[in-house]
Amino acid sequence: MAKLLSCVLGPRLYKIYRERDSERAPSSVPGTPTSVTNPHSSSWDTYYQPRALEKHADSILALASVFWSISYYSSPFAFFYLYRKGYLSLSKVVPFSHYAGTLLLLLAGVACLRGIGRWTNPQYRQFITILEATHRNHSAENKRQLANYNFDFRSWPVDFHWEEPSSRKESRGGPSRRGVALLRPEPLHRGTADTFLNRVKKLPCQITSYLVAHTLGRRMLYPGSVYLLQKALMPVLLQGQARLVEECHGRRAKLLACDGNEIDTMFVDRRGTAEPQGQKLVICCEGNAGFYEVGCVSTPLEAGYSVLGWNHPGFAGSTGVPFPQNEANAMDVVVQFAIHRLGFQPEDIILYAWSIGGFTATWAAMSYPDISAVILDASFDDLVPLALKVMPDSWRGLVTRTVRQHLNLNNAEQLCRYQGPVLLIRRTRDEIITTTVPEDIMSNRGNDLLLKFLQHRYPRVMAEEGLRVVRQWLEASSQLEEASIYSRWEVEEDWCLSVLRSYQAEHGPEFPWSVGEDMSADGRRQLALFLAQKHLNNFEATHCTPLPAQNFQMPWHL
């Protein structure tokens, strides 16, 4: 009877992974059926085959879940319509509650029928036995057996806790349950006394900003967190996850962040291969509709690196919602997992981000300064200009205030706090992070990210002459034009290197540098072009085109 209840309340099972061209060893978990432990299959993974009763009950519950999601998103409009029609009176609401209660009882009955269907299936009984054993005992053998199944990630046991590192428990400077530290935006009106009257005056605007951010804003910024989109992408995500496990021997893990969110991760270990880059770990930060199952992890994987992918809060198996604080909390536990559980030193970790993933990558670079390098692909400097681009001009004040208070993705500000090597990849036909049209390459916010970065590190070089010549170089629409500008100013790379190395030897590596202070205008132009060319690579593609492995290069450093 207990097993039947476990089948009723258990998670949905999607796939069962098998060893290729070999039989699985008999399970060591007591009570596991032996009739299904040795399936004859040449395929490494198979879809779980539910019985008819479970299959039909699952379809009904999935349909109910979709209808509930649609009702949730349309509830404000439905509430307004019902109010106008007078359907929210007590005489109308009571019968409706009876209908709703009856429907819930019917769905509960369907769930029980699904549980009976699972109970009659030896494959599901084997799975639920292993899952229960793993929850009772987190042994390596139980986890190894559980990894052979792909199921609803909410039931996956936690593999790593944010407080697990001993240094966190002893230190008072680490993250608290309120979250890790973020850079806070400066007040819009400096010098204004924050009196009680001023706070009352600001309250309506603050309430409006909060409502916009938590309803329309968050879903526009992170469409991957919308349940209906995830439901539509589920077959693709399952296929991508199977590829990572099957072909790359990936290991899935659940991490618990300091805010209580559970983060879904996938680790591919290449340290045992002959390729030297396998000793380096690339932590991948996906875009606003990207998942590690089908995202940018494929690029460093093809290049031979060890890779750790993770999903944003609210994406696929990760819980929560993707606000900046939750994003930083998730990134913190991912880095801690890489260091303290996977055994990589910060000097062997590379941060690779695509698009909006630049926020978490630059936060980690700022917070973990010993990290080896940062690669930002199709990223931007600040969210405000991009948000203003898609909203009505009359909303400018509301949009700016909402972004600064609730959705402040200040990539450039965070990147300038990092001292290590950085490479920016600019998509020359990017249609997402341009503020006008894709053909206007100067409206690409990747340009602003590069300029702010160089102006912080080399303020004397990026004075008026240097800034002007770098803008000319960024405006070039082809490699031929870039080379023409580079040769026009007769950039001597050996001279630039000698100047930078001599400054570093005399003053140390800490940025910002005052190099170029006593230099001629021509020398500053040469240095500015040299540094811009070393920190930015162009990729002739649109925003969502996968980056080829040959374009995944380590950043330049002295």
From Swiss-Prot:
**GO function term, MF aspect, one:** monoacylglycerol lipase activity
User: What is a single cellular component term in the Gene Ontology annotation?
Assistant: membrane
Classification via Pfam families: ABHD16_N, Abhydrolase_1
Q: Which residues cross the membrane?
A: 60-80, 93-113
Alphabetically sorted, this entry's keywords are: Hydrolase, Lipid metabolism, Membrane, Transmembrane, Transmembrane helix
The chemistry this enzyme catalyses reads: 1-heptadecanoyl-2-(5Z,8Z,11Z,14Z-eicosatetraenoyl)-sn-glycero-3-phosphoserine + H2O = 1-heptadecanoyl-sn-glycero-3-phosphoserine + (5Z,8Z,11Z,14Z)-eicosatetraenoate + H(+); 1-hexadecanoyl-2-(9Z-octadecenoyl)-sn-glycero-3-phospho-L-serine + H2O = 1-hexadecanoyl-sn-glycero-3-phospho-L-serine + (9Z)-octadecenoate + H(+); 1-octadecanoyl-2-(9Z,12Z-octadecadienoyl)-sn-glycero-3-phosphoserine + H2O = 1-octadecanoyl-sn-glycero-3-phosphoserine + (9Z,12Z)-octadecadienoate + H(+); 1-heptadecanoyl-2-(5Z,8Z,11Z,14Z-eicosatetraenoyl)-sn-glycero-3-phosphocholine + H2O = 1-heptadecanoyl-sn-glycero-3-phosphocholine + (5Z,8Z,11Z,14Z)-eicosatetraenoate + H(+)
Coarsely, its chief localization is membrane
Keyword hit for Transmembrane helix: yes
What start-end ranges are recorded for coiled-coil regions in this protein? none
Establish whether keyword Transmembrane is in the entry.
yes
Leading EC class = hydrolase
Name its cellular compartments. Answer: Membrane
The task this protein performs is described as: Phosphatidylserine (PS) lipase that mediates the hydrolysis of phosphatidylserine to generate lysophosphatidylserine (LPS). LPS constitutes a class of signaling lipids that regulates immunological and neurological processes. Has no activity towards diacylglycerol, triacylglycerol or lysophosphatidylserine lipase. Also has monoacylglycerol lipase activity, with preference for 1-(9Z,12Z-octadecadienoyl)-glycerol (1-LG) and 2-glyceryl-15-deoxy-Delta(12,14)-prostaglandin J2 (15d-PGJ(2)-G).
Q: What's the name of the protein? A: Phosphatidylserine lipase ABHD16A
Q: Which organism is it from?
A: Bos taurus
